[in-house]
Amino acid sequence: MEGVTIVDHPLVQHKLTLVRDKSISTKSFRELIKEIGMLLCYEVTRDLPLADTVIETPLATMHSAKIAGKKLVFVPMLRAGTTFVDGMMDLVPTARVAHIGLYREPHSFAAVEYFFKSPSDLGERLAIVVTPVVATANTAVAAIDRLKERGAKDIRLACLIAAPEGLERLRGLHPDVPIWTAAVDEGLDENGFILPGLGDAGDRAYGTR
């Protein structure tokens, strides 16, 4: 699908297999999501602009490259997105972090917002929405809608797994938002959960039901 990149690096796929396993502990689940977040961040930021700069090494003066002209804001979707984004922050510690709290109404699957906090200069930043799962995409669409309302112009999305139905809806409503995912699963069940999926990422990360 155009605009969707599947990150098939062996390390990502290995760690995703471990994450899917229902027998792992909450601690292992959180640690693995953080590690995958770091690996996906590497791919999502691959095309950041570079500028030449002059530095002094211990032995000589040299020209070298630094990221320039692009400020970042990570946008984890609560709850499990906060664990996912920790690995990204390890790579880009100077990035800002916005938070969006959305839950999916269990009967209609509609997205309900309960929290939103972001930097005031969203229009000047590359916003990377971070969510473990894109199932129906209702919450992802609502998050992107909200970011655009607040002035964000350059938005990307990173997730662990996605359903074809969710990707189609997200790309249809926001074709300007590219997506990076570790896997595209078979589809959705009657309750809107991804099959085979990985379960409820928030519950598995924090030991709730």
From Swiss-Prot:
Annotated pathway: Pyrimidine metabolism; UMP biosynthesis via salvage pathway; UMP from uracil: step 1/1
Positions bound to uracil: I194, G199, D200, A201
The name this protein goes by in its record: Uracil phosphoribosyltransferase
Pfam families documented for this protein: UPRTase (PF14681)
Record entry for activity regulation: Allosterically activated by GTP.
Protein family per UniProt: Belongs to the UPRTase family.
Required co-factors: Mg(2+)
Enzyme Commission number(s) of this protein: 2.4.2.9
Disulfide bridge partners, by residue number: none
GO molecular function: GTP binding; magnesium ion binding; uracil phosphoribosyltransferase activity
InterPro entries: PRibTrfase_dom, PRTase-like, Upp_B, UPRTase/APRTase, Ura_phspho_trans
Binding note for cofactor: Binds 1 Mg(2+) ion per subunit. The magnesium is bound as Mg-PRPP.
UniProt binding sites for 5-phospho-alpha-D-ribose 1-diphosphate: R79, R104, T131, P132, V133, V134, A135, T136, A137, N138, T139, D200
Top-level taxon in the UniProt lineage: Bacteria
Keywords for this protein: Allosteric enzyme, Glycosyltransferase, GTP-binding, Magnesium, Nucleotide-binding, Transferase
Gene Ontology BP annotations: UMP salvage; uracil salvage
The reaction(s) this protein catalyses: UMP + diphosphate = 5-phospho-alpha-D-ribose 1-diphosphate + uracil
Keyword hit for Transmembrane: no
Function as written in the Swiss-Prot or TrEMBL entry: Catalyzes the conversion of uracil and 5-phospho-alpha-D-ribose 1-diphosphate (PRPP) to UMP and diphosphate.
